[in-house]
Regions:
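Hydrophobic/small residue at the entry helix of a nucleotide-binding pocket
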Residues: 33-34
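Conserved SAM/SAH-binding loop
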Residues: 97-105
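Glycine-rich phosphate-binding loop and adjoining beta1-alpha1-beta2 segment
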Residues: 46, 51-88
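Conserved N-terminal Rossmann-fold NAD(P)-binding element of oxidoreductases
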Residues: 27-29, 52
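N-terminal charged helix/coil linker that caps or initiates catalytic domains
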Residues: 1-26
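Acidic/polar active-site rim loop that often engages polyanionic ligands
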Residues: 59-67, 148-159
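Glycine-rich phosphate/adenylate-binding loop
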Residues: 109-112, 125-128, 135, 140, ...
């Protein structure tokens, strides 16, 4: 009789499958990147996933986010993702936290976890998560700027200090220096030069990002999410 993980076990072995079943991964940001990371880990035998995001599924998510369908509009992203994972991996424990990640979120690290995926697009929260993970000794992989790009083949995994062509990475490097954070930060990033989106979409917006939202395809965010999941997966199966 076929089992859900039998093809995976052929590749990694029974001992690795057992390690995956005992692992817990925190994913912050269930978006174009984080949604695909959660999907991949849910299908790869991870025993426990903690999903954090305060947003609801919106029409503008339909072109790229795995959780976005006409049936899920206006629903919590974390709850939609959790239901999706339970539909194909009922043994995976999925905990949902419908809130923005900030400095008050450190209680999350009061429980055992094996890895963190940072799929946050707000710089201050991104650095807060990176610092918290480092402080608690939990490895973290961060996704950098994936908007305004077309080519998923230009993604790579290095550390933050080796990035280029990425305005978000540049701003994060500056914040890291100001905070005196010296640890190497593993990141998934794109070598592709980003497209400049200068079309006013929401004149009533309060911020530049609201007025000029980033352009996005499915290709790059999805590939970034799968890359983050792959980094985590490989670390977990090798950790025994």
């Amino acid at each position: 009789m076929e089992t859900p993980l039998e093809r995976l076990e052929l590749l990694v072995g029974e001992a690795a499958i057992q390690r995956l079943k005992q692992a817990c991964v925190l994913i912050v940001g269930i978006c174009g990147v984080g949604g695909y990371a959660a999907e991949a880990l849910g299908r790869s035998g991870i025993g426990k996933l903690i999903l954090v995001d305060a947003d609801m599924v919106a029409p503008s998510n339909l072109n790229r986010q795995i959780i976005a369908t006409l049936d899920t509009l206006n629903q919590s992203k974390t709850e939609v993702m959790a239901a999706r994972i339970r539909s194909f991996a009922p043994d995976c424990e999925v905990i949902t936290i419908h809130e923005f990640f900030n400095e008050q979120s450190e209680s999350l690290f009061g429980q055992k976890m094996d890895y963190v995926i940072d799929a946050i697009d707000t710089l201050s929260s991104k650095l807060t998560l990176i610092e918290m993970a480092h402080r608690h000794g939990v490895p973290c992989i961060s996704s950098l700027g994936m908007a305004n790009r077309f080519d998923p083949t230009q993604l790579t995994v290095t550390t933050l200090d080796k990035t280029c062509n990425d305005p978000l990475a540049r701003a994060l490097r500056q914040m890291v220096r100001k905070r005196g954070f010296t640890a190497k930060i593993p990141v998934v990033w794109s070598k592709e030069l980003p497209y400049t989106q200068n079309r006013l979409i929401h004149a009533e917006g309060k911020t530049l990002k609201q007025k000029y939202p980033p352009a996005s395809t499915i290709f790059v965010p999805a590939a970034a999410g799968l890359s983050c999941a792959s980094v985590v997966f490989q670390a977990l199966i090798e950790n025994g």
